[in-house]
């Protein structure tokens, strides 16, 4: 007995019903996944590495760490013009505050030194006496002095965010 095509055609069992829940579009799932993934990655960067791994980068070769900066010096006394032009970028002559701190440390090692250091004077000739940390400007700065070059190091914005977050959470 031959079968007719109409006997095997698809016939729904009941009237069509809409789906019970609406589905989120694929782009929304990608967006949500990206946001959650980003939060997880930032949390891992903040929580997993130790505090030491977020330290300042080391000073360049020939430079020495001093507080948040790096210093380099020439042991030969020189005139102001020569001292100002001798620091390679991004370094400049050491700022007065850092020079006073360095003088306090240096006085411990050589209390009898009477040398002078050129310091950054915002375009004017300025120097600092090593023995007592007294500075002089213009007319008092005729003699040669030592050049100490200095460049500051500061952590980037993300490193500051990480360390402040770790501090807020009480992490070591």
Curated annotation (Swiss-Prot):
The chain crosses the membrane at residues 28-48. The keyword tRNA processing does not apply. It is found in: Virion membrane. Residues 1-27 are intravirion. Disulfide bonds: none annotated. GO terms for cellular component: membrane; viral envelope; virion membrane. Coiled coil: none annotated. It is a single-pass type II membrane protein. Residues 49-172 are virion surface. Pfam families: UL45 (PF05473). Keywords: Membrane, Signal-anchor, Transmembrane, Transmembrane helix, Viral envelope protein, Virion. Important virulence factor of HSV neurotropism. Seems to be required for glycoprotein B-induced fusion. Dispensable for growth in vitro. Belongs to the herpesviridae HHV-1 UL45 family. This is Envelope protein UL45. It comes from Human herpesvirus 1 (strain KOS).
